[in-house]
């Protein structure tokens, strides 16, 4: 049976403020990209999410970001490479401790938001993130965009790279994501998204916003936990894949 990983961004609340339905998403996905406190998340909330993930057998990944709570990590920061390296090391280490206390472990790293998009093409920041992962644990896979500078830097350091596609985001013809500031960047119809994901998994391709066919390498599919209707979208994707004989399983 064919298999694919489903991942979602979780643990992104802060204090009394909650974002998304982490418990419901943990019943659907196979991997949880857990915030590390720099773009979202507080220690108590992160411990709660990691405990719930451990109970459900969901893999935990460190979702590292720029130090940007106010902007939710969605703003580019021109940070020096050595500072970014230290920030990423710190975030992975913090979540490793929390996951360990919860009876789980961090088994991969995924950059978040603006950092994710920046290191597709930014050599210095891509190298800093890859080197930070290597310094913490060279056995940790990194989740990201195929063909990115980040993947080149990670592979150069012997890190395993895991290519992901986005269930609910529109793609540009060059393979990058359409900016959230643009109309149609975030998709919302659960049934249409589910069919789109099945096509991605079956054919290794997706239709870009200009109608052209875009080849994709897909080992994991991200469903954003903070999108409107996230639980309904994730459920539709899971159910459609299962109906087509595709097993939902973690990559690590």
Curated annotation (Swiss-Prot):
Single annotated GO MF: ATP binding
Database matches in InterPro entries: Glyco_hydro/deAcase_b/a-brl, LamB/YcsF/PxpA-like
EC identifiers of the protein: 3.5.2.9
Record field: transmembrane: none
Protein's UniProt keywords contain Ribonucleoprotein: no
Catalytic activity from the UniProt record: 5-oxo-L-proline + ATP + 2 H2O = L-glutamate + ADP + phosphate + H(+)
Gene3D superfamilies xref list: Glycoside hydrolase/deacetylase
UniProtKB keywords: ATP-binding, Hydrolase, Nucleotide-binding
Lineage: superkingdom: Bacteria
Biological process (GO), any one: carbohydrate metabolic process
Family designation: Belongs to the LamB/PxpA family.
Assembly description: Forms a complex composed of PxpA, PxpB and PxpC.
Protein name in the entry: 5-oxoprolinase subunit A
Native source organism of the sequence: Mycolicibacterium paratuberculosis (strain ATCC BAA-968 / K-10) (Mycobacterium paratuberculosis)
């Amino acid at each position: 049976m064919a298999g694919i990983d489903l991942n979602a961004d979780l643990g992104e609340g802060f204090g009394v403020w909650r974002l998304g339905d982490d418990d419901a998403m943990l019943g659907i996905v196979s991997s949880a990209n857990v915030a590390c406190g720099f773009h979202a998340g507080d220690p108590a909330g992160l411990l709660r999410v990691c405990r719930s993930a451990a109970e459900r057998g969901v893999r935990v990944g460190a979702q590292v970001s720029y130090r940007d709570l106010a902007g939710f990590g969605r703003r580019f920061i021109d940070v020096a490479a050595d500072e970014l390296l230290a920030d990423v090391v710190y975030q992975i280490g913090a979540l490793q401790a929390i996951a360990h206390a919860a009876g789980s472990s961090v088994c991969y790293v995924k950059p978040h938001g603006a950092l994710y998009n920046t290191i597709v093409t930014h050599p210095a920041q891509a190298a800093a993130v890859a080197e930070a992962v290597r310094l913490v644990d060279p056995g940790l896979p990194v989740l990201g965009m195929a063909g990115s500078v980040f993947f080149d830097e990670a592979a150069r350091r012997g890190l395993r790279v895991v290519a992901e596609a986005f269930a609910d985001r529109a793609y540009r013809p060059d393979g990058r994501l359409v900016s959230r500031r643009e109309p149609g960047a975030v998709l919302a119809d659960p049934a249409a998204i589910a069919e789109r994901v099945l096509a991605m998994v079956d054919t290794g391709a997706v239709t870009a916003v200009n109608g052209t066919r875009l080849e994709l390498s897909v080992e994991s599919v991200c469903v954003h936990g903070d999108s409107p209707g996230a639980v309904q979208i994730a459920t539709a994707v899971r159910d459609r894949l299962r109906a087509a004989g595709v097993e939902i399983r973690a990559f690590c």
